[in-house]
Structures are given as C-alpha cells and as structure tokens.
Amino acid sequence: MANEQVFPPWFFDRADESPDTFFYAPDRLVTHIDEGAIAAVGELYDELELTGDVLDICSSWISHFRTPPRRLVAMGMNEVELRANEMASSWAVKDLNVDPTLPFDDATFDAVTCCVSVDYLARPLEVFAEVARVLRPGGPFVATFSNRCFPTKVIRGWLSTDDEGHCAIVATYFELTAGFERAT
C-alpha cells in the first residue's frame, strides 16, 4: 500500500520546515521526559534484555538504559550532546529527515531504540526500512514516545491526534515496513 493512500499529503509536514540542523544546533543537556517516564523506559529496555549491540537513533546525551548494553551506538543531531552520552561506545551525527539511510551493514545490531523522537521523523517509513535492514533477525525496534514535543518540529499528523492515535501511527509505520513481524 502506497504511503499516499495511508497518510494525507500534509501528514509529514511540520510548522517549521527550516533545516533541523538549525533547530538542534544549541546544546540541550536536559531530559525531555519526567523521572517516571525515564524509569519506565529503562525498565522496558531491561525487560526486553537489550544487552548486545544496540543502535540508539535520534539520541542525545542520555539513552535511558539502566543496564548499559555491550555496545551502544548513539546517533543524533547534536555532537556535544552525543559526546556527553556516557553509555555510548561510539556516536554519529546524522539528520534522518535529510538522509534516512543508516551507515551500517545489514544485520549489524541486536536492537534499535528511538526514545521520544519517532514523532519528529518526516520520512518514517524510510527510516523504519533502514532499521529493519540493520537489525539482526528477530531483533526488536523499540520506539517509545510521550505526549511532550517541540510542536514546531513534530509532524502535523502527530499533532492532529491524541495518545491513542499516536500508538496507531507508530503501529502503522511497523505494519507498512517489510521486516517487522508485529508491533506491540
């Protein structure tokens, strides 16, 4: 099913269409979710046993793991924030809205995480396809999200719905991407 048939033409537009490199240039060494949400994400990562080689896309200075994985590659938009990520084994600056390709070989990672940033992806189906490509067979893609956002940079489709709708949006991304068995 074509993307245009599922999402209206305006769905991936954003109020601020200026390059994300401008918006994310200032260092933000802050948490974007509260302590309860941070704890819940850490518990989820522990429950899913994300202990091997993990790629954290749309990352920043903290990756919310309670137990660090063996290898964590943090990929995000701000070099200072990524360098400050003490759990990261390595990091890369990348704007996935400009170029959604991931600079890794097929089947490189045991898991991929995207914490509170899936709503900023203007090309999510391309990103999800790349995630499926770099995951080892059976590896999870854990996309967590909240009700907080930078409203000028989040996609309009996200702003047009509620929390239940947000779950449906992300589930649809998984359903439309080859390589994922099911979204839970």
Label the model's feature ranges.
Residues P140-T172:
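Conserved class I S-adenosyl-L-methionine
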Residues A2-E49:
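Class I SAM-dependent methyltransferase Rossmann-like catalytic core
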Residues G36, A40-L102:
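Class I SAM-dependent methyltransferase SAM/SAH-binding core
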Residues D110-L125:
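A short SAM/SAH-binding and catalytic strip from SAM-dependent methyltransferases
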Residues A40, L44, T161-T184:
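Short alpha-helix
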Residues L125-P140:
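A short glycine-rich, Lys/Arg-flanked "PGG" loop and its adjoining helix->strand segment in the class I
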Residues D99-V112:
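A short acidic, Gly/Pro-enriched loop at the edge of an enzyme's catalytic core
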